[in-house]
């Protein structure tokens, strides 16, 4: 009998970023550094991920998964529960590869949002360098040493997730691929992975998910998207008009509206795809008073 604390995520999902870090789910309860060039098969069977799987098989409630436990204790449906509903808990043949792939494609972004920082947008880096030079700010690096820097900066260069390591065998179980950034639509290399899924004959059973800031359209990918079962586009909109441009600097509201309309017209051009669109707000003290106003605008779209 499956434990009531069981989570199927480590058995069905892999999250990867452009820095060669892997994790068992979208929330990243643990992040494991792997050498560049490590095969997807070796990433999937990494000992640290297997250790977490064994904890769930033994009926444990791993402390690494604190976010889900806290949400459940507060009466909120957690990612663990949603994943169990989506994939079930009778997991077989999991060793052959993931069903769901979550990729943080890049740290490159064309916005410096108030809710973000340097690890997810390269546009913050010049500001971080300014603070370091003017105020001598410091941070702790990955070796535990104090070095010049702050959370607006990254020691890594601009990087993109490599699609070259994925083989047809790695994709044999895939049902969903989610793309986050940075800004995933700025990463043209991820189109290689889409083509590999198509070539593997899996596109017609695979859902694609994107979280986009709406500052660009998907003209480079629409022909690829047209071959997939379902495409989900989440628009990151924390406010409208002047509030949007403040919270998501240097975003342009008129351009944002035009681009959203472009996305919403995709079902007319590709009616065989199951399209899904949703607005997504990052709520903070900066926008909570206008939350309903923004939500109403999104509903009207």
Q: PLM features: residue spans?
A:
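Core AdoMet radical
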Residues: 98-108, 119-161, 172-188, 200-219, ...
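Recognition helices and adjacent regulatory flanks at domain boundaries
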Residues: 73-100, 109-111, 132
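Distinct, well-ordered alpha-helical segments
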Residues: 189-195, 218-225, 290-292
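Acidic (Asp/Glu)-rich catalytic clusters
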Residues: 223-230, 267-268, 299
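Detector for the c-type heme attachment site
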Residues: 69-71, 116-122
């Amino acid at each position: 009998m499956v434990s009531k604390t069981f989570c199927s995520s480590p058995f069905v999902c892999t999250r990867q970023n452009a820095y060669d870090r892997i994790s068992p789910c979208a929330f990243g309860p643990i992040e494991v550094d792997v050498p560049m060039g490590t095969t997807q098969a070796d990433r999937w069977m990494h000992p640290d991920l297997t250790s977490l799987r064994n904890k769930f098989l033994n009926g444990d409630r791993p402390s690494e998964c604190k976010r889900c436990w806290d949400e459940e204790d507060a009466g909120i449906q957690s990612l663990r529960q949603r994943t169990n509903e989506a994939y079930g808990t009778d997991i077989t043949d999991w060793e052959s590869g993931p069903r769901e792939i979550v990729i943080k494609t890049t740290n490159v972004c064309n916005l410096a949002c108030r809710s973000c920082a340097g690890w997810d947008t390269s546009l913050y880096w010049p500001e971080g360098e300014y603070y370091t030079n003017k105020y001598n700010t410091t941070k702790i690096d990955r070796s535990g040493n104090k070095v010049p820097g702050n959370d607006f900066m990254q020691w890594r260069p601009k990087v993109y997730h490599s699609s070259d390591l994925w083989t047809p065998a790695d994709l044999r179980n895939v049902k969903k691929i989610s793309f986050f950034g940075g800004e995933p639509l700025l990463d043209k290399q991820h189109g290689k992975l889409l083509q590999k899924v198509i070539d593997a004959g899996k596109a017609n059973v695979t859902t694609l998910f994107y979280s986009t800031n709406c500052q660009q359209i998907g003209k480079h990918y629409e022909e690829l998207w047209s071959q997939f079962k379902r495409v989900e586009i989440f628009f990151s909109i924390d406010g409208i008009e002047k509030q949007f441009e403040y919270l998501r600097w240097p975003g342009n509201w008129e351009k944002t509206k035009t681009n959203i309309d472009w996305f919403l017209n995709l079902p007319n051009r590709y009616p065989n795809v199951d399209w899904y669109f949703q607005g997504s707000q990052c709520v903070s003290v900066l926008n909570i008073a206008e939350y309903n106003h923004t939500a109403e605008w999104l509903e009207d779209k």
